[in-house]
Each structure stands twice: as structure tokens, then as C-alpha cells.
Swiss-Prot record:
The lineage of its organism: Bacteria, Bacillati, Bacillota, Clostridia, Eubacteriales. It comes from Ruminiclostridium cellulolyticum (strain ATCC 35319 / DSM 5812 / JCM 6584 / H10). Keywords: 4Fe-4S, ATP-binding, DNA damage, DNA repair, DNA-binding, Exonuclease, Helicase, Hydrolase, Iron, Iron-sulfur, Metal-binding, Nuclease, Nucleotide-binding. ATP binds at residues 8-15. This is ATP-dependent helicase/deoxyribonuclease subunit B. Disulfide bonds: none annotated.
Amino acid sequence: MGLQFIYGRAGSGKSFHCLNSIKTKQNKDSNKKLVLIVPEQYTLQAERDLIKVLGTGGILKTEVLSFRRMAYRVLNEVGGITYPHIHPSGKNMIIYRILERLKDQFTIFHKSANCKGFVNTLSTLITELKRYNVRAESFDEVLQGLADDNYLSHKLKEIKLIYSEFDSMLVDRYRDTDDELTLLSSKLEGTEIYAKSEIWIDGFAGFTPQEVEVISKLIQQAENVHITMCTDILFDDVQADLTDVFAAVKKSCKKFVSIAESYGVKILPPVCLNTPNLPRFKDSRELQSLETNYCSYSYRAYQLPTQDIELFESVNIYTEIEECARDIIKQCRDNGMQFKDITVATRNLTGYENLIGVIFEQYNIPCFIDSKTEITNHPLVRMVLSMLEIFTENWSYESVFRYLKSGLTGIDNTKIDILENYVLACGIRGSRWTQEADWNTSIEFRPDDGQKPENDEMLLNINKTRNEIREPLIRFRNRTKGRRTAGDFCAGIYEYLVEIGVEQRIRNYIEKFTQSGQLRLAGEYQQVWNILMDVFDQAVEVMADETFGLEKFANVFKIGLAEYKISSIPASLDQVLVGSIEHIRSHEIKALYILGTNDGVFPSAGMSEGVLSDADREVLDKRGIELASDTKTRAFDEQYLIYRTLTTPKNYLRLSWPIADHEGRTMRPSTIISRMRKIFPKVTEKSNIVKPSADKQHIDLIASPIPAFNQLVCALRQKNEGIEQGEIWREIFAWFSGQDEWKQKCDAMINALKYRNIAAPVDKSKIRELYGKSPYFTVSRLEKYTSCPFAFYVQYGLGARERKIYRMSPPDVGTFMHAVIERFSKMVDENNYSWREFDRQWCSEQVSKIVDELLDSMKNTILGGSKRFKALAVRLKRVVTRAVWLITEHIRRSSFEPVGYEVDFGDGGAYPPMVIELDSGEKIRLVGRIDRIDALRAENGTYLRIVDYKSGEKDFKLSDVYYGLQMQLITYLDALWEYSDKSNGEKIIPGGILYFRIDDPMIRCTDNSTPEEIETAIMKKLKMKGLLLADVQLIKYMDNTIEGNSIIIPARINKGDVLGKSSAATIEQFTVLRSYVKQLLKDMCSELMKGNVPISPYKKKKLTSCSYCNYSSVCQFDQSQKENSFRMLHDREDNDIWKLMNEIDVKDN
């Protein structure tokens, strides 16, 4: 018996030496048992390599094993596979059960026990303890040496409790993967299965105590054991230099020598493969220099420009992968490499793998991404989990529609979309899903409106869809009510899936993907279905006869599913391998691309301590309990990983890094890059931060049709913007144009480049269809046209509406309060009450009564059907009561009397519509509703003032009238004025146009403020805004109490009855204003009927018409495009506006 070390630096040929030794032994003694042990992930490659070296087409006489394969082989032969194997998901379920049962006994882990992810953390710790041969009772001796009140003592007691409970639940029931090597070593002790065999152990960077124990048993049995070690020298004073990159390897060597000597096993002369020129790098002096100098402090710089080593700095991750793909194509095209010779590795595979898959497909690079995909985002798993969440979250919107959008329910997507709109609009959740009665809530928010016929049909279809969804779900819930076993829940879920046809749909998907050649997806769906069934089995096994509610089962089930991942196998031999740096295999890799060589990524900086801190591990180590490395040691181990990675390729190494992440945050290059620059002062460095300018540089962008076409699009767009491009793009365009499969795309590209974000005029025939033969508009809608013609067209022409969400928006609040004030005003009018005689209590009672009546009439709307909105409506009573009382105060202080409420002008209204005749002969009718008309009859005529109720802040600006943004009140006044002129009725004189704000504002007051002072302050805060007739006597009639500044109207009278600073205009100015607005409306309607709907929003100071627009995704307004710019509007002094209007009025007349 003997132990031999085969050692050498990376690339020295250790694996090749093992394979040749096996060949020699096999030829010399064909009856001897030969065994090659390699890491689990390398067994297939090792078998291929051995077949290649042997040249026999098979390896019947040699076993290629991993330690786990050896465990299965031995236990299968000598016994030990008695109990079912438990999957990590089952382990996590057990740990969850233990935490649920014991968490009240914990002090250290009491809060952590309820934290998401703590189960996985404990599972990782238990795995570590088992791999390092630490049993629960191992902590007893440590605990004896710690004070009872010591923090670590409490922690170890709780870990021991959890660990011992975990083991007791496994014993005589399950076989844990983490125990297999321990069981293997015990079985090897009592058998001679590997007696007189020759064993080679290759490819390990380090060994766990479990593996060391197995190797010690093999050393006792085998004729010879050969272990490869990646190191410069075999033995050294490890303690003297922990920073030595090979320190861990040398420590392992000493450990094995000690074991061999303790069993009296001979130490055979070691095989040293270190030479000045290592075999792997025989074709590359640069890579040889890198291996020699990277870990050497007294390095020797390589002074020549590099050909085999390249550094690349990229703008972002996407372009980094693109440049990697181009270079792979170049290596295969120019240097004769095959895809199978190339490996792409990164320390952040999760952040790169999806983009690599997409970009490599564009470049026609076949690749195999060596990673496992979590199944929690798979449609089947998402459907089952969200189905359980429907009940644990009480039919929440999120859970219901996550379930429905899984695509496996069999319900049509259009039905789901309609249902979703309705549910969002009506805020449906909870018991409203399960109630027997049909849903009948109207999504329209209009007091006194009846249900529309089209809504009846829509509700009928929605209720059909709802029943299709809820009935099988309710049947499942009835089968699983109360406390049940895991078996009951799993059976219930399976029956539910079969009932709604999910099992058959999965089969159909698998068949469809198989027939279309999408084998990866077919395998994925098959795996996920099998995994789901496996989790059912694990849950039933682990939870046994224990009973619990649905919520607890859902938590256990989710924990079980989270441990499963989907794996795939390579589709062909000739493809690029993409994987994590930790798992790449050095054998036969000619070119290595390392992506994401950034600071904190590679080498890694995110090393968490876990449950046991570094200090805890140090205490345990001193007391004889060896565990995995602490963060300090792992940081040194990271240097060994860097060394192994950089020395992996035989011919070519390329390191790249992005300077920014997905969110644009700066990323720095790794310390590896600075080290490379020192060793190779003339290293080849490239970057895509500065765009290439010469044709020679552009050629590098041409690697494959799809990305080349994308680059062509970019080049032509830049040329379109006036940036000169190289001649090469003309040739590339000619090539694509000449290819049948690309010609249509070229035409589409040219059309796209010619595209300008300009809304073309709408055809007149379509305008007639949209607005009718006798169009009518409200003035507020025409103000929208002024704000942005295109937004007007989308909203009122095409009828696009924002998705209704269950809330009372400001317009809804305004509508409701308007309705209350309207009813109150009509009640006053119909009963001939006088506003001047009301008291506050009576107003409050009447408002409350009207609100209740409105709620009753709206019981089938959002407001009427919701307790929350009913409560909101009650709170609005206070606001409306304040508004009504304020109206009362205004009328009391004024000589004007209300003569009309909610007065319509339009067909069937109190006044006919305003008719605007266009130059084309077309007639446009303007309609509207005036909230309130006040009148004062005098000898020279009747003064009228228009009052418009606003639930939000609204100021009157003459410049806004000039720009067409505030035409409503002037038009209302003009409608009355015009009707008076035509009907030869009493003479109408404009008294004013005013905005009345409906609000109950907060005001500043002191402890000494009297109720009268508070009321006065509120009235000042809610003072009406608008434009009055510049007549001192008339203003006094509007506010009989005015002294100086009025507290109810925008006016001031100075001493001597002189009109002070006021928002006022003369009768002549009102006439000009009337004429100007009428002409403005005519011009606007003329443009509208011509179909002119340009994307032309305005900007005034910081406010733009895009600020609150819902249609920005439709118009795609973009200031970076020349044709897209704001119309700049500026506030002007009133005198300037009057001059401009007078000039226009003179021209028109």
C-alpha cells in the first residue's frame, strides 16, 4: 500500500499524467481494478478524456467516479440504501416544521425563525456541519467551556436543538445526501471492495473532512492511491505564509501524509511535473508568463505587445456581451477555433445568462449555459402557488390575476382582460368573489344615470367568466377546509389541476414544443410537472399525519418548491460553454472569455458570515471543531480561484468589464486588471466607449447578419442626423438589399428612418365619421384642443380612455359635489326659498339629506357599493356644507339674485346652442352647462354674472383667455348675450364671470381667534376669482359690505369710490373679449374639421400640457426630435393682452 502525490502548477499536465498512468496499468495488468475519482461535475468529461487516451472506444476496466457515485456504488453492493432518499426540498420542509414547533423556545433565533430565507440559512449550516463530520453532541464539550450567559453559548444550544431534532426526524425514515459520504466511510471499513485496487484522485481544489475520511479508508485498502495537487512545491511552512496562493493545498498534503503515516502506509516518491515551460502553454509564451508571474510578488514583466491576452472595457453589460460574441466569431473565422474549444465564464452568471442567450442567438453562436433555472417563475408553479394565495390573501387582486395570467387556466385572455378592467374599476376582492349574487356595480360614476344597455351585456359576460373561475376554486376550498394533512392538500391540488384540464394542457405543450423542435422547452415543462408531483410526495412523506391549515401548508409547499431547479443537457458537442467561474473545467479549453471582471465581483467581496460568525468559528476551531473557512480565509481562497481561472486556457484569454450596470451606476475594473497591466505593460486593450471611426474598425462590427443589420440601422440613423459614416456601410447596405430575406427589412428600415413624429391630418371623411354630420362640442373640450390638438383627437375623436381604477379621482369628487349643490339649489328654487334666510344648521341638515339620497340612487356604482367610499362621501358632506353656506353668505352680501342653476345651452336646453359657421359653410354647435347665473335688474338693463363651481384651485388669467386655455366662462356669457340680442328680450349687460371654489380649507389662527375672525379668514381664502365689469356701483352691488378689499370678489374700492386694483374690464373690453373668443373658437373649429391634429403641446413656465396627459405613450412626443417641441406660452400683463386683442378685433372688423 502506498500514497503518492502528483503535483505541479496549473497546466503542468497532472490530469494527463493520471490518464496515461491508467493506460499503462491497464496494459500491464488487465485484471487490476482501476479507479479515477473526480469532482461530480467533471465525471462525464473525465470519461471522454479517458476513452480518448485509451483509444479503445470504452472504459470497462476502469471506473470513473465522484465521491457520491462511489457512495451509491458501495452502498448498493454491500447494503445501506434502506431508506428513501430525501430531497433538499424535503429537508427544508422538516426544518420549517422544527422552527414552527420550537420558535417560542428560542432567544437568539426567535425573530429570525419567521424571516424569509432563514430556513435555507439553517439548511446550509446543517449541510456544512455534516460535511465536516460535526454531530449535534459535538457541541457539548464546547458548551461546557462557555458561560451560560454567553451569547455564543445560547446560539450553540439553539443550533444543537435544531440539529438534533432534524436528525431525529430523519433517523430510520430517510437517507440524507449529506450523510452519504459518512456512511460510505463506515461501509468501506468493513469491506474490501477496493482492496488491491489502484486509485487516482484528480481535479480537486480542496477536500472536506467527509472526503478526507473516505480517502483515509481508501488509503488503507488500495494498493496505491495517487492524489493530484495543484501547487508549486509539495510541502512548505503553511503557518509562515497564509497569503501563499497554494497554502490550502499544502495543508491538505500534510493532512494526508499524517493519515498515511498513522496507518503505516508508505509515502511513495512524489511526481513533480513543474517545468519552465508547462505543456498547456506550449503554444503561448504570454499565457506561460501569466502563470509564472501572476501570483509572484517579484514578477517579471512581459515587455512585448500581447497577441493571446486582451483586455476590453465596455459601456455596459449588453455591449460587453456583444463584443464577446464578435470576438468569438473572429476567433473561429480567422484562427480556426471551434465553438467547443471556447468557454465564457463569469462570477455573476445570474446577471449575464439571459443576455448571453439572446445575443449569442443573434450571432448564430450555439451555446450551452451551465446553470439551473429556478422553477418558481414557471407558469405551472406560478399557477399553483397563486391559487393557494387566492385563499391565504382573501381573493386579492394580485393573487387572482397572477393565477389567471399563468396561461394554464383554459380561460380566454380577452375574457380575463375584460374581467380585470372591471375588477380594478370596482375594487372587487374577498367575499365579493364568492358571493352567489351576480355582480351589478356600474363602473360609470354619474349621479342619477341609469344603467346603459351595453353595460348590461358586459356584466352578463363578466359574471359568466367569474363563475367559470370561482366554481372549481370553491370546490377545491370545500375539499380542504379546516385542519388537514399534507396528503389531503396535495390530493386536493392534484384533483383541481385534473378537473380544470391543466395536466392535459401540459401534455399538449410538451407535444407542441417537441414537434416544433423546441426540445429545451419541452423538457422544461416535463421536468416541472414531475417536480410538482415529487414535491407532493415529499410533503406527504415529511409532514406525515400532522394537520394544519391551508396557510401553513402553502408556506411549507412554497419552501419545498423553492429548492428545485430545472437543468438541461447540451444539445450538441460543438457549442460554446457558458458557466460560472467556480465550475469551469481547465481541460481542453483553448479560449477563455471572462466577463464582468469588476471590483467586488471577481474577486468577490460579498462574503456573508452566515449563522456562525468568524469569531464563532475561531472559538470552535480552538476547541477542536473544524468548519468551513471564515471570510478572511475565503478571501485568500479567492486568490487561488483567480489563479486557476486565469491559467485555464491554452491559447487565448480575454478579460472584459463594463463601466456601468443595468441602472447606469458606475462600476470599476477589478484589481485583476491592474495586476495584468503590471505584468503586461503592452497588453492589448480595447474599448467600445468611443465609437469607431475608420472603416477598418467598423469591419469588426460585422460578425453575423442580425447584429450587422442592427449596426447598419445605427449607422444610417447617425447619417440621417448629419454624422458622416464610412463607405463600408454603403457596401453593407447593398449586400442586405440584394438578399431576398433582408430586402423587406431594408425597405422597412428606410421608411422608419424617414419617419417623423408628426401627426398627419386626418382624412375629412373620417372626421365626419368621428364627429358626425352636425358636430357639436363643449367649450372645455375645445380648450383641450388648444392645449394639445393630438390629445384632443385621441380622447374625444378616437374615444381612448384611461383604465378605470377603484378610487375617487378629483373629477369624480367634483362631479359628486356638483350634484349635491345642484340638488340643493333646485330644491331652493322649487320651494321659493330665499338664500338670505337660511341658517347654518338647516343647510347642514339639507346637505346631509341630499348626500344620503344620492348615495341611495348610486347604490350600483362604485361610490354606492363601497363602505370606504360611503365614509368618504360622509366626509364630503362637511365640504359641501361649507360651500353651500359660503354661497349663502355671498348672496346675503350681494344685491344679485340667482336666476338659474345648471342652465344648459344646447338642443333641449334652456338656451339654444351657439352656432359657429365656418368659412367652409360647415356649422359647429357649441353646448355647455352653466353652474349658476346671478342677475341684477337695473334701469339700463339686466346685469348678469356667471358663476362656475370648481373643486380645485382655479385662477383667472387674461393671458390664458388670449391663448385659448380659458374660454369657457366668456363663451357662456356670450351665449346669454347673443340669445338676448336675437330674441329682442331685455338688454343684457355683462356683470362678471367668476370661479367659486368648493373647499373647506385649513387656515392659520391663534388661540385668541374668535369664530367670526375664523369665518372671515375662510371667506378670504375662498374668495371668488374672475373678471368683473369695471363699475364701482356694480361692484358695491356684488359686495354690499366692501371696504377696501372685498373678501368675496376680486375687487378693491379706494377712498372716494375709486376702483382700486381689481380684476375688472370695461363694457367695451368685454365686447372685445367676446369677439376675440368667438373668432378663436371659429379658427379652432376650422382647424379641427380640416383634420389638423398636430402633436403640439404647450409649455408655460414649468407647466406643460403633457404634465397630466394620459396619452404620452400614444403620441411619443420626444424633444430630442427636431419636429417635436413645445409651444412656448408666456404670461403677459393685462394691458398688453388688451392691446393685442384690440388689434386683432380691428383687423377682423
